[in-house]
Amino acid sequence: MYDSVKGFRDFYPKEMQARRWAMDTLEDVAQRYGFREIGTPALEPTEMYVDKSGEEIVEELYSFEDKGGRKVALTPELTPTVARMFVAKQQELSKPIKWVSTRPFWRYEEPQQGRFREFYQTNVDIFGSAEPTADAEILAVAVDMLTDLGLTGEDFEIRVSHRDILSGVLESFEADVDVPEAIRAVDKRAKVDHDEYLDALAEAGLSYGQADTFDEMLQIDAEEIETLGDLTGSEDVRTATDNLQAVLDAAEDFGVREHLTVSLTTARGLDYYTGVVFECFDSTGEVSRSVFGGGRYDDLIEGFGGQPTPAVGFAPGHATLQLLCQRAGVWPAEELSTDYYVLQVGDTRPTAARIARDLRERGHVVESDVADRSFGAQMGYADGINAETVVIVGEQDLENDEVTLKEMDDGEQVSVPLSAFPGDYDRPTFEDFAE
């Protein structure tokens, strides 16, 4: 008897049916916006993450040396991969590029609520537009994904910030500040106690007094963020606040501004983020961690050897989305769904197989007996797979040139002429033949 590996999960059919619904919903929204599906490898060179992703992800890599002596890693995230893919075909691709991909990723971290060592995400990215409209479209896709899953604005909150505001404020202090390290501290602000957070800012180069001032500035009211440029005397901060406002204005045009909250304590810990960043949270706090996040990474393509290319994207994680949907009561029941079970009694397989094939050709989920079971065993199986309708094809039925249609929810049944079933009906049921 073997157990599954810690942090890795099995998904049985009932669970997968609900998960498939969620994945299809996310991908359908992206495709309605014109995002095109791509496929990506499970392995990448380890050095790609060492160079591009930041210390936290590098520490969590599943990395090893393959039989050819190459250092490789299971992909912990997709953004570096799609950046590499974009650079490889940059001259051939018509821009802007809009890509979507759903697949598993791997990080060696401690499993906890909504976090596993193997996890699934749907990545959505735009390459080739620096316009606030691109940021707003990404935010609109995120909101539409959530609402198409059945969530309402009362269920979630998307917190929006700007990395250039954070870096500009940090650089305005007269201190030798490690800006990326300080931003990583901000990203962990809600996950550690306040003193530990201030210690992290101090380790990044701020004095404790400056750290307190910086933290107070992060909590400024959204309506007053534009004053940060004057407070800091930083032109970079002024430019960033203008850009953030332009994104919010575009989000208003997309119809999603009401779902966005400006929060400068939102930072995103990965080093490659540049401009607008955002994270989605459960508005009740019951799902304690971020549901998903995203933002701009305008420098990453150039860092991969490509021409300077602005980019923006996000990646909803399926595990945390499931937690949010379950908390809100919109996650579908984890049960099998079968339209028809074609039950055969005696030597009736040719007719039963023909009926099953006809129903499948109409797009229905149809099962039939493949184990030579008794009538009672087949009925029990039909109930177990949640079949809506059972088509009974018995020898006595066929002698009368008919089959029996039985609805499983109420037990009603009716005899139907064999020549009339399935007939011209797209979804033939008891009601179509009852007198």
UniProtKB/Swiss-Prot annotation:
Subcellular locations according to the entry: Cytoplasm
GO MF term (any one): ATP binding
Reaction(s) this enzyme catalyzes, per UniProt: tRNA(His) + L-histidine + ATP = L-histidyl-tRNA(His) + AMP + diphosphate + H(+)
Ranges of biased composition (kind: Basic and acidic residues): 424-435
Region described as Disordered: spans on this chain: 415-435
GO biological process terms held by the UniProt record: histidyl-tRNA aminoacylation
Any GO CC annotation of this UniProt entry: cytoplasm
Location (main, coarse): cytoplasm
SUPFAM superfamilies per UniProt: Class II aaRS ABD-related (SSF52954), Class II aaRS and biotin synthetases (SSF55681)
Enzyme class per UniProt: ligase
UniProt-listed PROSITE patterns: AA_TRNA_LIGASE_II
EC number per UniProt: 6.1.1.21
Keywords, in A-Z order: Aminoacyl-tRNA synthetase, ATP-binding, Cytoplasm, Ligase, Nucleotide-binding, Protein biosynthesis
Family from the record: Belongs to the class-II aminoacyl-tRNA synthetase family.
Entry protein name: Histidine--tRNA ligase
Record organism: Haloarcula marismortui (strain ATCC 43049 / DSM 3752 / JCM 8966 / VKM B-1809) (Halobacterium marismortui)
